[in-house]
Amino acid sequence: MSDFWHKLGCCVVEKPQPKKKRKRIDRSMIGEPMNFVHLTHVGSGDMGAGDGLPMAGTVQQQMRSKCGRDRQWSNSRVL
């Protein structure tokens, strides 16, 4: 009887799921931006001296003044 279960176990094997092929996106599928709000420009004058990073306080202050909200902008990605 154990031989039967051994042979049955060899036949019942979990097969790997085939990878789903992602649909390719072309330019005709992409439309104009919706609900776009332009807050500010960040140019070379807004960059920190020598470090190549924007001065966070200045950029955040510009964004607050442009959108008219008193929202506290954070540096984290979690909103």
Swiss-Prot record:
InterPro entries according to UniProt: CRIB_dom, CRIB_dom_sf, SPEC
Lipidation (S-palmitoyl cysteine): 10-11
Domain CRIB: 30-43
Gene Ontology terms: cellular component: cytoplasm; cytoskeleton; plasma membrane
Biological process annotations from GO: regulation of cell shape; regulation of Rho protein signal transduction
Record keywords: Cell membrane, Cell shape, Cytoplasm, Cytoskeleton, Lipoprotein, Membrane, Palmitate
Membrane-related topology note: Lipid-anchor
Highest rank taxon of the organism: Eukaryota
PROSITE patterns linked: CRIB
Subcellular location: Cytoplasm, Cytoskeleton; Cell membrane
Molecular functions per Gene Ontology: small GTPase binding
Alphabetical list of Gene3D superfamilies matching this protein: CRIB domain
Function statement: Probably involved in the organization of the actin cytoskeleton by acting downstream of CDC42, inducing actin filament assembly.
Family designation: Belongs to the CDC42SE/SPEC family.
Designated name of the protein: CDC42 small effector protein 1-A
